[in-house]
Regions:
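Histidine-acidic metal/acid-base catalytic patches
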Residues: 2-173
Length: 173
């Protein structure tokens, strides 16, 4: 929160934040999960990987625990790496939501990351139903930009349309 302190001390309206909703992920990334299944990984193996991530077992130790499974299905190693890298997730995003509340007055726009929005207008790994109420309860009047990460080969127009509809639904618009 040193950045907030600097913003407050300078009073500048040109210094701020552009939060990326990917940091709130609480479930594994569907496109990576599906890709691993297609490459021969099992639900059991993937669930074990996810649980190790939830339990905050370090990646190096997790790779050792899963070594035999990775040997049988090399794609599992890549999926596991992604769970600790680009598409991380955690049990809860409460701490991150508290951080969002603190920086909201200094946000220019927000990146509404999505990887897969299902037909029921639910992003399966990022808890928009927790994020949007925090934004709605604030004085934020900027944009939430749809940032579709085309990882799974889904229809980008459909995914973007679903994301916009999901956010509007959560905002009761």
């Amino acid at each position: 929160m040193d950045y907030v302190k600097v913003i407050e001390e300078t009073g500048s309206k040109y210094i701020g934040f552009v939060p990326d909703f990917g940091c709130f992920a609480t479930k594994p990334n569907k496109p990576y999960w599906d890709r691993a299944l297609a490459a021969g990984a099992t639900e059991e193996q993937l669930n074990k990987c996810a649980q190790l991530r939830y339990d905050e077992v370090p990646l190096e130790e997790t790779m050792k625990i899963m070594a035999e499974d990775i040997e049988k299905c090399p794609a599992l190693g890549g999926t596991l790496n992604s769970m600790y890298g680009f598409v991380q997730f955690r049990k809860s995003c409460t701490k991150e939501l508290e951080g969002l509340k603190r920086i909201l007055p200094y946000c220019f726009e927000m990146h509404g990351k999505c990887h897969y929005v299902d037909e029921n207008l639910h992003e399966v790994s990022i808890p928009y139903e927790e994020i949007i109420p925090v934004v709605a309860a604030s004085d934020y009047d900027g944009f939430i930009v749809t940032e579709y990460e085309d990882e799974g080969g889904y229809d980008a127009i459909e995914q973007t349309t679903r994301h916009v509809a999901m956010v509007k639904k959560l905002l009761n618009q």
